[in-house]
Amino acid sequence: MRAVSNSSPLIALEKIHQLELLRDLFSSVTVPPAVARETAPTVKLPSWIEVYPLTSMVDSRTVRSSFGPGESEAISLSLELRPDRVILDDEPARRLAQKLGLNVIGTLGLLLSAKRRGLIPGLRPQMDALVATGFFIALELYDQVLDLAGERS
C-alpha cells in the first residue's frame, strides 16, 4: 500500500518513537515539499520517505485559504498520485479529502493498524504517550479506539 502524509502524523509518530511503523504499514510513503519543510525542525525524514514535487495544486480557494501549506499540498499530491491512503489528522482536512474521494487515515488509525498487525503490543501506551506530548485525543475517541483494539477495561 502507498501513502501520502501530512506533517502532523509524522511529527506525532516521531515524538513517540514510532515513525518506523509507517515503513511496516506501507510499501511507500511520500510527502510534498511543504510537509518536508514543516517537519524539518522536528523530524529528520528517513530515506524511505520520498519528497515528491507537486505538478499542480488543487484549484480550490477553500483548500488554500482553510488549510496550511502541508495539508493543501498533501491533498493535492494525493489527488495527483492516488495513493491507497492519505495520512491526515486535522478533521476539516480529512473531511475535504474524503469529499474528494481520497481514503484517509490518521495517527490513531495507523496505531490501530499496527496493533492489529502485531507491530506494537498495545495501543493504550502509545495513545498515552501521544497525549503526554500534547497530542489532543477527545475522551470519546480515545475510548472508541481502545474498544476497536480490544483494550478497553
Q: Which role does the model predict for each range below?
A:
Residues 116-153:
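Long, charged alpha-helical interface segments
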Residues 107, 112-119:
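Long, charge-dense
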Residues 1-85, 91-94, 98-103, 125, ...:
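Active-site-proximal, substrate-binding regions of enzyme catalytic domains
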Residues 62-66, 111, 133:
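Conserved short-loop catalytic and cofactor-binding motifs
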